[in-house]
């Protein structure tokens, strides 16, 4: 959530930031509500002052034995009016809060201008694109021929955008999870968290999924539970409503979880393969930092995610998202896009974002800089470290052989029991 004081003091600057995202709607309704709130507060304050004066006059009259009946009656009327206005103030403040919850974060000054992914800016490339002496196949075709992913039975048992991994496919998925967790905990210094797969609405609001993206979430009917769309939600909310000791920052957490997304806006997109599933696995990196350190920490977090792809030998590029392509809560985002030779394109495999104090304000996550200093909002960051199913897809396409088998990347062999290649599964 944006700082309401900034919106009040610099509405033109906030409107310019929102316009960079392609949001033409101004802040007129917010400013109108805020003015109404201020007018109500002025009226309430005036009535309370009057009530205090009348109370003093009533006390004086009673002390001198005079009749104060009329003043007492008028004071009752003032009290009723104050009560009525207090209700109006609460209603306007709630409406203001709902307006603030709808506003996305303001893009950082370093974010490129633009309104769609066509305006995103490549930052760097890593690795050489593989060359094949045959026509490379897409990962879903490779997986089906090897018998390691069952798309048809996934659809039968659960519906579209669900799959079964089997045999070496299931083993590869598990190997990648363990490989990523070991890299981030042992080498990069993250503390592992194993979070709940369901959270309450306060947690969804804290990270920015609610109220705007309710239709993209799986909600357990009749309860306050939501299936998590990413481990970012439970791990960020780990410290919701808390004041962290300043000396503990930065805090680095890594979490593996299954993720659940309705993909309400993705009808007709990526209907084949592992790229867009309702349920998928991901290893997530989450950081809590001091405000002055957060952009340096974003660069580190991005490099930590990149190392996964480098160790697996998967060519990729880093792209800075333009203002119009940023996620709702992000102030700046780098996407890692892995090369997919079967479809001859780069596909997102990780998003690494700095949310500044946007999530922390919604979730009330603060830190105390020093023993006698006032608490301040932390900055939160997160990034995929990385999406597991998409990594499986990238390995199948980049390590495919002409005979239909797939080589195991050297870094994964210890996690695959020494297996050097994936051969067709036997029914």
UniProtKB/Swiss-Prot annotation:
Reactions performed catalytically = tRNA(Ser) + L-serine + ATP = L-seryl-tRNA(Ser) + AMP + diphosphate + H(+); tRNA(Sec) + L-serine + ATP = L-seryl-tRNA(Sec) + AMP + diphosphate + H(+)
Q: Where in the cell is it found?
A: Cytoplasm
Q: Which terms under GO biological process does the entry name?
A: selenocysteine biosynthetic process; seryl-tRNA aminoacylation
One Pfam match, given by its short name, reads Seryl_tRNA_N
Enzyme class, broadest EC rank = ligase
Molecular function as annotated in GO: ATP binding; catalytic activity, acting on a protein; serine-tRNA ligase activity; transferase activity
Return the CDD domains for the record. Answer: SerRS_core (cd00770)
Record flagged with keyword Cytoplasm:
yes
Q: Which residues does the annotation say bind ATP? A: 261-263, 348-351
Query: According to its UniProt record, where is this protein mainly located?
Result: cytoplasm
State where L-serine binds.
Answer: 230-232, 284, 384
E.C. number(s) listed in UniProt: 6.1.1.11
**Annotated pathway:** Aminoacyl-tRNA biosynthesis; selenocysteinyl-tRNA(Sec) biosynthesis; L-seryl-tRNA(Sec) from L-serine and tRNA(Sec): step 1/1
Subunit structure of this chain's protein: Homodimer. The tRNA molecule binds across the dimer.
Functional description taken from the UniProt entry: Catalyzes the attachment of serine to tRNA(Ser). Is also able to aminoacylate tRNA(Sec) with serine, to form the misacylated tRNA L-seryl-tRNA(Sec), which will be further converted into selenocysteinyl-tRNA(Sec).
Name by which UniProt lists this protein: Serine--tRNA ligase
Q: Which source organism does the UniProt entry give?
A: Moorella thermoacetica (strain ATCC 39073 / JCM 9320)
């Amino acid at each position: 959530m944006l700082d309401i004081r900034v919106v009040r003091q610099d509405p033109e600057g906030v409107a310019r930031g929102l316009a960079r995202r392609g949001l033409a709607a101004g802040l007129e309704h917010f400013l109108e509500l805020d003015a109404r709130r201020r007018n109500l507060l002025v009226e309430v304050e005036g009535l309370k002052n009057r009530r205090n004066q009348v109370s003093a006059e009533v006390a004086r009259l009673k002390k001198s034995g005079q009749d104060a009946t009329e003043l007492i009656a008028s004071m009752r009327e003032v009290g009723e009016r104050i009560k009525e206005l207090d209700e109006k103030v609460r209603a306007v403040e709630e409406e203001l809060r709902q307006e603030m919850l709808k506003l996305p974060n303001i893009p950082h000054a370093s974010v490129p201008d633009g309104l769609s992914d066509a305006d995103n800016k490549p930052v760097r490339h890593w690795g050489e694109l593989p060359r094949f002496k045959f026509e490379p196949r897409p990962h879903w075709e490779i997986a089906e021929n090897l018998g390691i992913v069952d798309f048809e039975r996934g659809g039968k048992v659960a519906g579209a955008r669900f799959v079964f991994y089997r045999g070496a496919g299931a083993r590869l998925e598990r190997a990648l999870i363990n490989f990523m967790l070991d890299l981030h905990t042992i080498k990069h210094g993250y503390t592992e968290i194993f979070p709940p797969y369901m959270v309450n609405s306060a947690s969804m609001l804290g990270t920015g999924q609610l109220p705007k993206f309710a239709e993209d979430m799986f909600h357990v009917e009749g309860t306050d539970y939501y299936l998590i769309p990413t481990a970012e939600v439970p791990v960020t909310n780990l410290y919701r409503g808390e004041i962290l000791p300043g000396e503990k920052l930065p805090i680095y957490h890594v979490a593996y979880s299954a993720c659940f997304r309705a993909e309400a806006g993705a009808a007709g997109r990526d209907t084949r393969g592992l790229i867009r599933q309702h349920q998928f696995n991901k290893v997530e990196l989450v950081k809590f930092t001091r405000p002055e350190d957060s952009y340096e920490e974003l660069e580190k977090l991005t490099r930590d995610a990149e190392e996964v792809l480098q160790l697996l030998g998967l060519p990729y590029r880093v792209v800075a998202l333009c203002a119009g392509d940023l996620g709702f809560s992000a102030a700046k985002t780098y996407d890692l896009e892995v090369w997919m030779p079967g479809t001859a394109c780069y596909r997102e495999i990780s998003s690494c974002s700095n949310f500044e104090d946007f999530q922390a304000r919604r979730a009330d996550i603060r830190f105390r800089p020093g023993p006698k200093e006032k608490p301040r909002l932390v900055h939160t960051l997160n990034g995929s470290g990385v999406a597991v199913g998409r990594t499986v897809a990238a390995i199948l396409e980049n390590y495919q052989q002409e005979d239909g088998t797939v080589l195991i990347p050297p870094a994964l062999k210890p996690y695959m029991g020494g297996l050097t290649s994936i051969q067709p599964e036997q029914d």
